[in-house]
Amino acid sequence: MSSKETIPMHQRSQNVAELLTVLMDINKINGGDSTTAEKMKVHAKSFEAALFEKSSSKEEYQKTMKSKIDAMRSTRDKRKRESVGSASMMANLGQDGTNNNNNNNNNNNNNLNMAASFMGGDMFGRNQSPAQNSNANTNLNTNVGPGVNGPNGNDGTANPQMFMNQQAQARQQAAARQLKNRQMGGSSAQQQQLTQQQQQLLNQMRVAPIPKELLQRIPNLPPGVTTWEQVTALAQQNRLSAQDMSIAKDIYKIHQQYLIKAKLQQQQQRQQQQRQQGNPDVNNNMAGSNNNNNNNLPMAQQQMQQRQQQQQQSQQQQNRNPNQRHNVLSQINQMFTADEQRALLQEAMEACKNFQKTHFGGQMSDANKQAFIKKFINSKALKKLEAMRMAQGGNNNANLNKGQADMLQRQQANMQMNQQQQRAAQNQRRGPVMNDAVSQGYNNQMNSAADSTMNNSNQPMNIGNNGVNMIPNQSQQQQQTNRPKEQTPQQPQQRIQSNRSVPMLNPTPEDVEVVRRISAEAAKTQLRLTDLTNSLTPQERDEIKKRLQKNQQLFAQVSSYAPQVYLFTKSESFLKEVLQLRIFIKEILEKCSKGIYVVKLDTVDKLVIKYQKYWESMKIQLLRRQQLLQQQQQQQQQGMDPNRAQNSQQQQQQNQANMQQARNRKPTKNQTTPAIAASVAMNMNDKGASMSPALQKAGSAVPNFAQQMSPNMTPGTIPPTNVLSPHSQSHIPMVSPTMAKAASAAALKNDTASSSRRGSTKPRGKSTAPVTGKKTSNAPTPQVVPATVPSTTNLSAAGTPNIRNKSATPLTAGLSPKSTIRSNSNTALASAKTPSPMTVSIPQPGNSSVFKKEEEYLSKLQLRKEEIRFRQKQRLDILSSSPVDLFLTTVADCLGINDEEIELINKIPETTADNINNTGKKKLTKAAQKLRDKEILNVSIQVGEKDKLIMSSKAPDKVMDYSISAMSLAAVFKNLSSTGSLNNIALSGSNATTSKDIGNIYSHTGGVKRKFDEVEISPNSNGSPSASIMSESKKIKIDSPEDMFVTHSSEAAKGTNNSSLMDSGKEGSCKSMAGSATEVNDTSIWDWNFWTSIE
């Protein structure tokens, strides 16, 4: 046996050419167009390639190819003979109809072409006389076209397009003869009254919309013409040529045949249902009795009725044996197009791969694979066939005037089903695509496996359609069979359906297996993360930390509820993607907690947006599930308790409104709507919609960091997004540069960095209200009292722990009054929230307008402070190459000069100007543009002869005054020397002052670590020292810049007011009170009037 590789390429090309020649002949007989011919070329090449791959030897390849070509040739010859015979039969029948039209004494009226000519003559030619119909008991059942299921119905390869072309050609010839005979004897023909059924059909034809497929074949029709009545009006107006009229008449007859056949089938189905209800035994003798009644019918009509009887008998056998599986692979080529077949084959192969992984551990024989694919495709074909049957059965009692837009589609499906039944009996030929993928062997052991796989992959829950669309094929057959017998009340049926759909909400073993498998696959994901720490600026690192920390619970929610969403969506791709992202997020969080950054800021933004979209869609699915449960409960309560059913309906309407709100809302932030979250959580807890233990066990195959972050969160409830467990924040250290820590049980965290990024934060009015009572906790919270009493201040600088001095300390220079007020306000608010037995709750006024003026003033001060910081940062970045411009613009800010009036001395580099104005070749990325949009000022550079740096405010008033008092500005330049030249200006005695300050501030321990002295907590505390207040971890290095804000107790006791700590200038305000004649009393900082008196 020679190898198939020895076959030369020219021989293979010759085989393709021979096969293509036969296919082209068949296409020409069928009346196909050039598009079909191009598809034939592709099919021929695909068939030869598949056959070559499938063949094991050269002899097998040649033998199979020869047999296939011979079979195709025989089919072509047979098609030619049938086409000629059909044309001649139609011509003869048309001639008989013409003779009957000319003879008024002929009582035989069983030919359908005569009825068609009646309708066509009355429709298109009012002056033409139809033939006399003296047979009063003629039934419409005899008016069946001989070509509807004529000789072409016996061919296993015919299609509806070829059938329509043949019938149109035959009827056109018959109509031409009839038209000629009528023109010859039209004056002598007598008008005949139509029967009631024919008149009804004629009226229906006048108003019925012409199907789109037929309407396109009529040339020169103006737009808007959709009925035959409109076409007739055009003909009477002579707007259609004779050729157009001839084509329109042929199309009219085809449309008429469709309506007649549809009505005939409906009538036969009603008769069949009546016989089944009356006496089931009559069905066994139905073929014989019907044959006795058809002795006087033409041969074509008898053949058609015999085929319909066979179809009915086969359907009855299927109804008696609903569990029996039929092999309809022989009809694949007629049920699916070539593209659909390829897609179906690809889907079957994917399902086979998944089944192989889950049941055979990667090992599966070729025979089993082929049997599985064959079973999969056969089940698909059965489902499509059953769907067509249900569509046909559901339209039995429908009005013919309704649903006429899709009438042609249903009729084509019915015609296709009739031909498919005949081809199933012959089983002569299979599709060119499916025969090569499926072998002849059939393994019955794979049936249940293939069915379960298809049900899992191709039957998702359709929760939005008041039920779960997971009915198997056998159940559909039983419903179709028992449809006429379903005369019982609807209420028990609804209860049965609800009882059937309830178990479907619980996870099946297949669901658990899929979740476990996907979790295992996600755990094996290889992550290659690059350390980007050195390439990121400190600001970017802080921003990444804050965003990851802020969205931790969003990540946890999506990961926790993904298995539940999979239960009623069956979307494996969604579950796999979420689990893979969970591994990715977990790795990022672990690296970030160690100070290693593996992603950039724009990547974090993309992840957050993706998770927000996930959560929005998951909330909609959860609401749908809740709605389904309520519908089932409502169906069960109907007839028992009307009040409970009404309440259930109201709750269902509320859930629908919430779901619509969730759809319309854009996912901007990871915040769950309180109404939606509470509603879903309450209902899912009440109705037991939580995840089953089996699914929880399957989902725990991979470590779920979401459960660690929220240990109290159950799978059945939607957690609120504004609550984070203490353990969840342990993954990433707090990002805030300002942190107030206490040794008590309640830890107070104040993130000033996030508040500065958001803009203004309004302190609550109760921060200034008097507090009565006393706290015994160690929280560093001074109590606000209106009187002037000796107290110590707890002013914490940026990033330092709380610093306490035993003696009274004056107001630290460099700290603005608004900073002290905000610190005290936040501290008082935190003390009110701290659980303690000694805490006295502060009554909050019902009307918040009492401190509205103060709140607006503080908000304006906070906004001004943030803008000053931002302006100074922008000047440092843009004017770093020009110290003169940096100095002068800062002084101009302090003097309140507008930016547009300031002209820079040196030119700004072109690259810097293009980057700021975003006018260069390299545009900003989306992430960078988002960051720029979040900035509190609009920055731009006016390029000209003298450049200008413009920073406009986004505040509502658009104008902000950044000037400071003249006294404060003069204090900065108080100790200047050599003011004659700008290059020689210096601060006199600055070095000595710095040395003295350092000597006063730091202890003389030689640069070793030291511990702060323990002091009292608040002004009213007893001040008992405790060793637990400051641990060893709170020691500060001597070279720390934060020690600049600490005054040693021994030096503070002297009450020296000469040393002053000037502000670093980052705010640009330079608000230093050093050197002023007014000495600040330390007790006056608690007096509100003191701060309002400061300008």
Curated annotation (Swiss-Prot):
Compositionally biased region (Basic and acidic residues): 66-83
Bias kind Polar residues: ranges: 155-165, 448-473, 794-810, 817-847, 1050-1062
Keyword Transport included in the entry's annotation: no
Gene Ontology MF term list: transcription coregulator activity
Main localization category: nucleus
Described purpose of this protein according to its UniProt entry: Component of the Mediator complex, a coactivator involved in regulated gene transcription of nearly all RNA polymerase II-dependent genes. Mediator functions as a bridge to convey information from gene-specific regulatory proteins to the basal RNA polymerase II transcription machinery. Mediator is recruited to promoters by direct interactions with regulatory proteins and serves as a scaffold for the assembly of a functional preinitiation complex with RNA polymerase II and the general transcription factors.
Family label: Belongs to the Mediator complex subunit 15 family.
Protein name: Mediator of RNA polymerase II transcription subunit 15
Protein encoded by which gene: GAL11
